[in-house]
Structure formats: C-alpha cells, structure tokens
Curated annotation (Swiss-Prot):
Subunit structure, as described in the record: Recruits the CCR4-POP2-NOT deadenylase leading to translational inhibition and mRNA degradation. Interacts with TRIM71 (via NHL repeats) in an RNA-dependent manner.
Main localization (coarse): cytoplasm
Gene null: resulting phenotype: Mice are viable and grow to adulthood without apparent defects except that they are smaller than wild-type mice at 8 weeks of age. Males mice however show significantly reduced sperm counts and fertility: testicular hypoplasia is observed. Heterozygous knockout mice manifest neurological dysfunction, hyperactivity, and progressive cerebellar signs including gross and fine motor incoordination. They show spontaneous seizures, abnormal EEG activity with generalized epileptiform spikes by the age of 16 weeks, and have smaller than normal cerebella.
UniProt modified residues of type Phosphoserine: S19, S75, S98, S106, S124, S159, S197, S209, S229, S305, S710, S715, S807, S823
Region listing for Guanine-nucleotide binding in RNA target, in residue ranges: 1082-1086, 1083-1086
Record comment regarding domains: The pumilio repeats mediate the association with RNA by packing together to form a right-handed superhelix that approximates a half donut. RNA-binding occurs on the concave side of the surface. PUM1 is composed of 8 pumilio repeats of 36 residues; each repeat binds a single nucleotide in its RNA target. Residues at positions 12 and 16 of the pumilio repeat bind each RNA base via hydrogen bonding or van der Waals contacts with the Watson-Crick edge, while the amino acid at position 13 makes a stacking interaction.
Keywords of the record: Acetylation, Cytoplasm, Differentiation, Methylation, Phosphoprotein, Repeat, RNA-binding, Spermatogenesis, Translation regulation
Pumilio repeats: from-to residues: 849-884, 885-920, 921-958, 959-994, 995-1030, 1031-1066, 1067-1102, 1106-1145
Amino acid composition bias (Low complexity), ranges on this chain: 45-58, 491-503, 627-647, 764-773
CDD domains xref list: Pumilio
InterPro entries: ARM-like (IPR011989), ARM-type_fold (IPR016024), PUM-HD (IPR033133), Pumilio_RNA-bd (IPR033712), Pumilio_RNA-bd_rpt (IPR001313)
Organism, scientific name: Mus musculus
Protein name: Pumilio homolog 1
Length: 1189
C-alpha cells in the first residue's frame, strides 16, 4: 500500500510492506525515480477493500520484492494519523497499483504503519530529494542543538526484523527528547509505548510527529534518504555486487536479539560467515552484531552503558577473538567490485563521521598493489604482510573498498575525467608539494597539483582538529623521491615472509596520506607524476642546502561536495583552489644529503633482513620490531644543520641529525628514515596507514627529561631500554596538569616550554577497526568517538575499552604495574607511582608499597589522606616504616598544607618514642611554627597528646617567653597559647601571666586576646587570675559595651567567683534600662539576671518595673526595643513567682500597643506560653476577632 503524505509540508510516498492484507506482485517493473519509504508498524486490522492486487502477505518475515502493492484498508483511527500525515485527497495515484508499488530498488527502505488508501499522486525523486535535503538540514541543526549525549545506535530486544525507517516506534534506547524535558512536544492524543521497538510489534499509535520525543527525525532522513549508501542489507554479502532479493528473507530468519552479546552468539557468528548484520541500518564489521551505541552527536559527550559488555567474552583474549571473527570471511574476488554505479558512501557534510563499516579478508587472492596490472587496493593484503603481526595471529585489516567506490562514482558521473576507473586510480588522496625555496608558499605547488592529476581530498580535512592534517615536514622528502627512482619490481622481488614473521609497514603508494612524493612507488608507469614529484623534492632539498627553506603545501585536486559526491576538479571549489600551507617553514627538516643515503637504502632493500622489503631502517620501507644499528655515512655537525625532528630539541649532541618524528636530538648516529626514531618500531607510516596523525613511537633510546613517549608498553613490538625516558603510563593524557592540546598541528603554545607534552593524540583509528575514510575525529579503538576538544578526554582517561589502544586490557600495549622505575618524575613534578595512584590505578595500595615515596605522598592531597587513613589501623612496623622516612624532613611536613596532617596522626597514633622524637624536631622552631598556619596545628597536637610532665613540653612552652603578646594577637599563635594554657601545668605558665600585666583591658578588647583571657580565667591558679580580674573590674563599664570585652565579662559572670559576680552586678545596677538597649551590653544584663543571686536579681527586676522612661515605664520601653525585649523575657523566665506576677500586671495594660511592634510580639508570645502552661485565663491577651495583631 502506498500513499503520498505530507510531513512538515514535505511530500513523500509511504509504502507499507508489512501489512497482513497485502502481497507483492513482482510483475511490475521497478521505477528508480521514486524512493520507497517503509514503516515498521504492524498493519491494523482494517477491512480489506477490493483491489486487483490485494492479497495476504507471506508473513512477518517476508522481505519486500520488486512489484506493486495494492490498496489496503484504512487504519483504525483516522484522526490520530491525519494529525501527522495529512492526505491530499484531490490527487490521484497514476497507474493504479503499478504507480503505487513499483518503486522497488534492490531493497525497500521505509514503510509506514498506517494502511492509507493508495489514491494520491507520487512525486519524482528529484523533488523528494530537494525537499528532504531541506528537511535534513533543518533536522540536523535541531539534532545538534537538542540531542544530549545518549547512546543512540542501539536497538532493543524486541527488534526482530524489518527495515529501519525514519519514523520509528522506539528508535533510541534512551529517548533523547524525553517527555520530562519536552512534554509539550508529545503528540496530542497519541500514545507512545516506550517498550515497543520499531518493527512489526508497533501499532498505529506509535507513529511519531516531527516534534515527538524520538529525536533524530531529521537525522534519520539524512542518513536514509539523501545517502544512497550501501549501508543496507545489500552489504551483508560483503561484496559490492547487486544483492539477491531472496537473501534478505534468509537474513531475517537469522536475526538475533541486539541488546547484549552473549557467548552462544559468537558461535552463530562463525556459522554465518561473511553475512553482515546491521544495527539501525549501519553495517557491522565481519558479522559482529556489535552495539555501536557509543556514537554521540554531541562531541565528547560519550557515555558508557551499564550493560555494555565485551563482545569477545570476559575470559577471551581480545585479539584472539578478533582473529577468529576475521578468519571467517573468505577472500572476495575482484569481480565483486565491478557493479558500483548505484552505490555510494557520501560523507555527511555537517558531522565528522568516521566510516568503518567494511572489513574484508584479502588472504592471498588480492592482486598485489605494486604489480604492473590494475591496482585494486590501497594496501597490500597478502596474508604474510599484515599491518600488525601478533603471536596470536590477530590480523588487523585495512579495507579500501570505500575509496574504490568513490573513484568509481566519480568516474561514472564525470566521464570526462581520464585515468579514473573502478580498478585503477590514483592512490594518494592528496598531494603535498614542497614549494621551491624563496617562492610564494601559497602559489607554489599548483603545477604539481595539475601534473599529478586528480586525487581525493575529503572536505572534512578542513573541519577536523589539527591532528587530522599531515605536515609534510614530518617526513624526509628526498628519501621518498629517491625511493621513487627504484623499480617497484625490486620491492616485490624478495621472498614472502612466513606467517609468524614481523611484517612490513609500507611507506609507498598503498598509504592514504603520506609524504609528498611517495605516490611514485606504485605508479612507475606515469612519467609525469614521477617527474613532478622528483623535481619538487629536489628543489626542496637544494633550497635547504642553500639555507632557504621551502614551504610544504597541500595542493588539493579533488574533494567531496556537501552531498558527499566526489568531484574531481582541481580548484573548482572556493577555498580549495590554492595550495594550503600546512606547517611553517622549518630549516631543520631534511639534510641535503638525505637523497643519496635513501638511494643506497632503497637499492639494498632487495636483500634486506626482513622479508626483503626493508634492508636498513633508512629506506622507505620499514620492518616492524627490528631494531638495527644504523651506520650513517652522511653525518653532519649540528652547527651546519640542526636536528630535524619535528618535535624536539638538539641539546644533547653536536653531531645529532635525528629525523625521528617525536624526539629530541640524540647522541647516537643520525638516521634518515621516514619519520622514525633511531630504534623505534612504529612510526609515521603506521600513523598514516591508520588514518591518524601520530601513533608513532619516538626515539626511545636517548634519555632526556623534556620529552615523553607517546606509546609505551611491554609488548614485544615496543621494547624499551633501561635508560629510556619517562613514559606516560596507560593513557595518553595521564595527568591533570597536562595541557590537553599542545596547539595547532602540534606546535607548542606560548605558555608551554620545551618540557611540555608535545606528542599528538593517538591515531584517529587504533588497531582493529580502521578504515581509510575515518575522517571524523578521535576514536579509542572500540568505535567510540571522542572529542578532540581540550578537556574532553577526561571522561575517557580511566575508561577501559576492549580494544582501546591504551587500555589496560589491550593486548597491543599490555599494562604492567611495575614496568617503570618508581623514581620516574612526571612533568607535573610527581613520581609515576603517585601519578598512577592519583588516577585510581592502584585501588588497593598498601603503605609498604609506597616505601620511598612517603614524603611525596604526604605532601599530596590524595596521598596524605591515604597515609592518614592507613596510619590509624597500621601495624607498628608499618608506622615505623613511615616514620623513618618523614623524621628527617619533619619540619618540612609540619608547615605543608597536607603534610602537617601526617605529623598530627603520629602525635595521635604513634608510639611514645615517636611522639618525643617529633617533639624534638619542633624544639627550636616553636615560635615560627606557632605563627604558621599549618605548623600551629602540629604544636597544638603535640601539646595535647604528649604528657605535660615531659621535659620537652616545658622546653617547647618556654620558647614562647618574650613573644607571648605577639602570639596572642596572631591569628595562628593565639591558638598555641590557648592550648598551652589548657594542657600545660599552670606553674609553667607564669611567664604568660606576667606578660599580661597592664595589658588585660587591651587584650580583652582584642578579637584573639579575649579568648586567651577566658582560658586564663578557666585554667590558671587563683593567685594567677587575681591580677587579671582586678584589671577587669577597673574597666567593667567599658568592657560591658565592647564587642569583644563583653565576652570576658560574661565569662566571669558564668564561671567567676561570687564576689566577682557581685562586683559586676553592682556596676550594672542603675543602668539596666540603658545597657539593656545596647547591642553588646544587653547580653551582659541577661547574664546578670541569670547568674546573680536571688537578692540581686530581685533588685534588677524591681528597677525595671518601677523606673519611668518619660511618660511610660521603663518596662514598656524595653518591651519595644530590639535588644531589651530579650532582657524582659529573661526576667519573666527567672523571676520568682510573686515578682513574675508583678511583672505581668505591669505588662497587661500595654498588650494592645505591643501588638503593633515586632519585638513586642515576643513578649506577648512569652505571656501566652506562661498562661497556657499554668492554666491561667488569658483574658484580653487573646487576639482580636479580626486576627490583626
């Protein structure tokens, strides 16, 4: 059943291929001009209407076949469907059944779930493409802004079969447009059932509007309408030939639950062979029904799923599992790539999407790349020469079918372009041309671009982070040019190595973006190409010899337009016509004699030690894992030519001329290999083959603290000597103190010195899932895309992925706890042990394991907490181990923001001898420690936990003699003096009492001194406190009204002798009304009423009741005052019963007036409480009837 519907005023044909009332008639010819849109909803039980081609479908597993689909019954609820898809009843469907259903290509795409009358006119494909493109752009903008970081590409358990449509019942696992955030977007009267999937178990009311919470509506349109991608089931056979229509039915019967991946499914995958399943329409490599749920449309917002499991099982080696899965694929003949005109893989122009859908095993049947016959692939897929070779035979395959398809499409759509064919094409995607020295860097290279012919430049190169751009200065261009002069037959002449041999990283034409002139090595038949490349390299080298560096430039000859189509026309697009300069001129890139050395290296490569494809490490071909001595006859002093390493310095040697990719200049013989360090086993060629910028192991034999290795591990491929540099650890970004991004194209930022991390991030694709079209951004190897924005890697720093390049579970770089020296110092200043501990790599670390690092841990925030917790329950031996390390530097820890807590713990939990030993370390520094923020805490702990009868305590206290007042007025020292008064015997504190003579009033009004006065009154002997109290009584009136002195007077009233209290009360009498209205003195009056004797209390209360303040009594004035009302309340509380009755009778006449004042209400509340408590009739105290107070 098909009908033309309107979605947001975009017309489209909706065809239902799953209605139980329909059957398909194959006699109708297919019309390629009309897209067929299938939905996954089950057809409602509607009344069948008479039609010539109406019948029952074969079943839910029926696959759509070419033919027409007749008219079916209406849905059970027209209103709800019409709300979204309004039918234009005036239009007619031309041709009846033939016009309605004969639009089937190799496979139907999207059905609708509603059986609408096929009585409307369909639109042409051009119109639909135009409308959907506009809708896709709108939906893309909406999706980029609104979709949070959800796990999008994942189906639920109910996804049994059926193609995936754009209007899906439950497209995402977690709804990105949840009803809680966008409740107004929920369609009216449409019930959404979250548990339902987007297949035949959906119903009519699961049809969604463009504003419903399924999210990604426009996103789906872009991916399923605009792209005629082979991402459908036609790719399940692995080849590019036309797919059989009946194979879809077989695949549907074998579809499995896509929620999780358990053990028995691994066996099913092996039986399936090369059948490729898909998740939401995207093919998955080698038949693995993997969750590609880690893709996030918000960069860097990638979340791990709780049920995300290792595809290969918990106990299986990751590489072995991959090897088993890859081995199930048979080799595909070249003929499978013949019919590609109707298929393409356009790249989304608005989003960086690395496409890794295809992995094929070209084991032995592929035509060699360097053969004189047709060049079929970008890489050599002979089984003996693989990109990685591991003991468990993990074959990491790089596939070039997607690029071949682009060239095929370009040749088909642009027949005027010569030299492009599906089987023979220019292998290098772009040309890097070295402009002659002294010329304009932005116009040089145009001739090379015109001469070298069309090459593909994906337009994403101008939108990704600098790590996706390959500077020409990373590689030695003379070596590439010289290698081009050698015959490609020489490269193939050596015997093939056996399976267990270390295989070869190719630096020739099989690489995607490589050096400026390495495209020669597979194309010796093109003299123009060879001549242009050699000339440009020689000009570059001559300019360097003359001291005039040239500019490496990027001369694009082709690009992908915004729809993903390949356009081979140099300079046709704005912004791409002129060469793009990649790196600033670098006079230290290449030596003038590099070409001669490379010629000899290439000549010797036929008789090399590793399968004949690499003789010395200087040549354009490099064997993995071989670390050979490199005799260099062309060494030059560094005063003539500095180090040619791209990131590094030449501070170690006078004759260093190392051209390693990421290394310092070394004191070893120089080397001119293509971007390799002197003994590195993985270099720029691997980074280029993986589509990345820097999976390169740098020169790891030379020692310098100002650089770090980018890949460090203990596998056989990456051996490091004992004098190697300090590695990072498990992860690329290992420390919070690192800057996340060194800068554009690896250049250090102005604030980063030579010791800063300058190694680029890992490759765009790590081992196991690489494609030459992976242009979108960084991935961690398991298909999870991560953002290259600074700081975005934080959430992946501790995440463990099954095949991540730097994961502890990775088999390529296996982790080892003690694979490094513990004395290694990180650029942050911390040792690697502490750095790993801070990154939670050692959750069960013990005190004995940090021996030698106690001081460092003690001065770290997390390390100090670790030691504190361990010391509380540590054994005596463990405490002694820690104590031995901290004793010699105890003072340093005492004044440290974190170390002082470790010293305090020893005063709490250490042995008596340890406490005394630390106290001896304090002696001589008591004053300085007492005035220091952290040292004062240590002294207080020592005074508290060391018995006061110890001589060391008395000696410590005596050090403050002569500095008492200075300490008392200090914000830190006053705490030490207070602790001394509290913990030390009073006889030893007489010097403090003597220091206070004549200073009591001044100290009592001091914010810190008032505290010390109170401690003296609490703990000192009476004969010591007597002179202090005498001075206090002389200044009672002033102290009562002082913001600090009133606390001293209150303290005397609370804890002093009765005679001292009476003296203070005598000072208050006669001034109760005035002092009660004072902010500070009112507190003293309250204490007088509370702590005075009964007689004195009665005198104070009577004074308030009998005194008049103008026309009113003093009581009335006090009840209205913001401070004095508290004095009245206290009087009511503490007064004798008879006196309380007098007070209440005095208050009663003023009740009506008190209701007007905020503080008067407090008095009324107190009266109500009293009357209710005693059962007295409230009388007029109750509020008026209108409730106004």
């Amino acid at each position: 059943m098909s009908v033309a519907c309107v979605l947001k005023r975009k017309a489209v044909l909706w065809q239902d291929s799953f209605s139980p009332h329909l059957k398909h008639h194959p006699q109708e010819p297919a019309n390629p001009n009309m897209p067929v849109v299938l939905t996954s909803g089950t057809g409602s039980q509607a009344q069948p209407q008479p039609a010539a081609n109406q019948a029952l479908a074969a079943g839910t597993h029926s696959s759509p076949v070419p033919g027409s689909i007749g008219v079916a019954g209406r849905s059970q609820d027209d209103a709800m469907v019409d709300y979204f898809f309004q039918r234009q009843h005036g239009e007619q469907l031309g041709g009846g059944g033939s016009g309605g259903g004969g639009y089937n290509t190799s496979k139907h795409r999207w059905p609708t779930g509603d059986n609408i009358h096929a009585e409307h006119q369909v639109r042409s494909m051009d119109e639909l493409n135009h409308d959907f493109q506009a809708l896709a752009l709108e939906g893309r903008a909406m999706g980029e802004q609104l979709l949070p970081g959800k796990k999008f590409w994942e189906t639920d358990e109910s996804s049994k079969d059926g193609p995936k449509g754009i209007f899906l019942g439950d497209q995402w696992r977690d709804s990105a447009w949840g009803t809680s955030d966008h409740s107004v977007s929920q369609p009216i009267m449409v019930q959404r059932r979250p548990g339902q999937s987007f297949h035949v178990n959906s119903e009519v009311n699961s049809v969604l509007s463009p504003r419903s919470e399924s999210g990604g509506l426009g996103v789906s349109m872009v991916e399923y309408v605009l792209s005629s991608s082979p991402g459908d089931s036609c790719l399940r056979k692995g080849g590019f030939g036309p797919r059989d229509a009946d194979s879809d039915e077989n695949d549907k019967g074998e579809k499995k639950n896509k929620g999780t991946f358990d053990g028995d499914k691994l066996g099913d995958l092996k039986e399936e062979g090369d059948v490729m399943d898909k998740t939401n329409g995207l093919p998955v490599q080698n038949g693995i029904d993997a969750d590609v749920k880690d893709f996030s449309r918000t960069p860097g917002n990638c979340q791990n799923s709780a049920n995300e499991v290792d595809l290969l099982g918990p106990n299986q080696n990751g590489s072995e599992g991959l090897a088993q899965l890859t081995s199930t694929n048979g080799a595909k003949p070249v003929e499978d790539f013949s019919n590609m005109e109707s298929q393409s893989v356009p790249l989304d122009p608005m989003e960086h999407v690395g496409m890794e859908p295809l992995q094929f095993d070209y084991s032995g049947t592929q035509v060699p790349v360097d053969s004189a016959a047709a060049t079929v692939g970008l890489f050599d897929y002979n089984s003996q020469q693989q990109l990685f070779q591991r003991p468990n035979a993990l074959a990491v395959q790089q596939l070039t079918a997607a690029q071949q398809q682009q060239y095929a499409l370009a040749a088909a759509h642009q027949p005027h372009i010569a030299g492009l064919a599906p089987a023979a094409f220019v292998p290098n995607p772009y040309i890097i041309s070295a402009a002659p020295p002294g010329t304009d860097p932005y116009t040089a290279g145009l001739a090379a671009a015109a001469t070298l012919g069309p090459a593909v430049v994906p337009h994403q190169y101008y939108g990704v982070t600098p790590w996706g751009v390959y500077p020409a200065s990373l590689f030695q261009q003379q070596a590439a040019a010289a290698a081009a002069a050698t015959n490609s037959a020489t490269q193939q002449s050596a015997p093939q190595a056996q399976q267990g041999q270390q295989q070869v990283l190719r630096g020739g034409a099989s690489q995607r973006p490589l050096t400026p002139n390495q495209n020669q090595q597979g194309q010796q038949t093109d003299p123009l190409v060879a001549a242009a490349a050699v000339n440009s390299a020689l000009a570059f080298g001559q300019g360097l010899a003359a001291g005039m560096p040239g500019y490496p430039v990027l001369a694009p000859a082709a690009y992908y337009d915004q729809t993903g189509a390949l356009v081979v026309n140099a300079g046709a697009r704005n912004g791409l016509g002129a060469p793009v300069r990649l790196v600033a001129p670098a006079p230290v890139i290449i030596s003038s004699s590099a070409a001669q050395a490379a010629v000899a290296a290439a000549a010797a490569s036929a008789n090399g030690a590793a399968g004949g494809l690499a003789g010395t490490t200087n040549g354009p071909f490099r064997p993995l894992g071989t670390q050979q001595p490199q005799p260099q006859p062309q060494q030059q002093p560094s005063n003539n030519l500095a180090s040619s390493s791209f990131y590094g310095n030449n501070s170690l040697s006078s004759n260093s001329q190392s051209s390693s990719l990421f290394s310092q200049g070394s004191a070893q013989p120089a080397n001119t290999s293509l971007g390799f360090g002197s003994s590195s086993s993985l270099g720029a060629t691997l980074g280029s083959a993986l589509g990345g910028f820097g999976t390169a192991v740098a020169n790891s034999n030379t020692g310098s603290g100002s650089r770090r290795d980018s890949l460090t591990g203990s596998s056989d491929l990456y051996k490091r000597t004992s004098s190697s540099l300090a590695p990072i650890g498990h992860s690329f970004y290992s420390s919070l103190s690192y800057s996340s991004s060194p800068g554009p194209v690896g250049m250090p930022l102005p604030s980063q010195g030579p010791g800063h991390s300058q190694t680029p991030p890992p490759s765009l694709s790590s081992h196991g899932s690489s494609s030459s079209l992976n242009l979108g951004g960084l991935t961690n190897g398991s298909g999870r895309y991560i953002s290259a924005a600074p700081g975005a890697e934080a959430k992946y720093r501790s995440a463990s992925s099954a095949s991540s390049l730097f994961s502890p579970s990775s088999t390529l770089f296996s982790s080892s706890r003690l694979r490094y020296g513990m004395s290694d110092v990180m650029p942050s200043g911390r040792s690697r042990l502490l750095e790993d501990f801070r990154n939670n790599r050692y959750p069960n670390l013990q005190l004995r394991e940090i021996a030698g690092h106690i001081m460092e841990f003690s001065q770290d925030q997390h390390g100090s907490r670790f030691i504190q917790l361990k010391l509380e329950r540590a054994t005596a031996a463990e405490r002694q181990l820690v104590f031995n390390e901290i004793l010699q530097a105890a003072y340093q820890l005492m004044v440290d923001v974190f170390g002082n807590y470790v010293i305090q713990k020893f005063f709490e939990f250490g042995s008596h001898e340890q406490k005394l030993a630390l106290a001896e370390r304090i002696r001589g520094h008591v004053l300085s420690l007492a005035l220091q923020m952290y040292g004062c805490r240590v002294i207080q702990k020592a005074l508290e936990f060391i018995p006061s009868d110890q001589q060391v305590i008395n000696e410590m206290v005596r050090e403050l003699d002569g500095h008492v007042l200075k300490c008392v007025k200090d914000q830190n020292g006053n705490h030490v003096v207070q602790k001394c008064i509290e913990c030390v015997q009073p006889q030893s504190l007489q010097f403090i009492i003597d220091a206070f003579k004549g200073q009591v009033f001044a100290l009592s009004t001091h914010p810190y001194g008032c505290r010390v006065i109170q401690r003296i009154l609490e703990h000192c002997l009476p004969d010591q406190t007597l002179p202090i109290l005498e001075e206090l009584h002389q200044h009672t009136e002033q102290l009562v009204q002082d913001q600090y002195g009133n606390y001293v007077i209150q303290h005397v009233l609370e804890h002093g002798r009765p005679e001292d209290k009476s003296k203070i009360v005598a000072e208050i009498r006669g001034n109760v009304l005035v002092l009660s209205q004072h902010k500070f003195a009112s507190n003293v009056v309250e204490k007088c009423v509370t702590h005075a004797s009964r007689t004195e209390r009665a005198v104070l209360i009577d004074e308030v009741c009998t005194m008049n303040d103008g026309p009113h009594s003093a009581l009335y004035t006090m009840m209205k005052d913001q401070y004095a009302n508290y004095v009245v309340q206290k009087m009511i509380d503490v007064a004798e019963p008879g006196q309380r009755k007098i007070v209440m009778h005095k208050i009663r006449p003023h009740i009506a007036t008190l209701r007007k004042y905020t503080y008067g209400k407090h008095i009324l509340a107190k009266l109500e409480k009293y009357y209710m408590k005693n059962g007295v009739d409230l009388g007029p105290i109750c509020g008026p009837p209108n409730g106004i107070i």
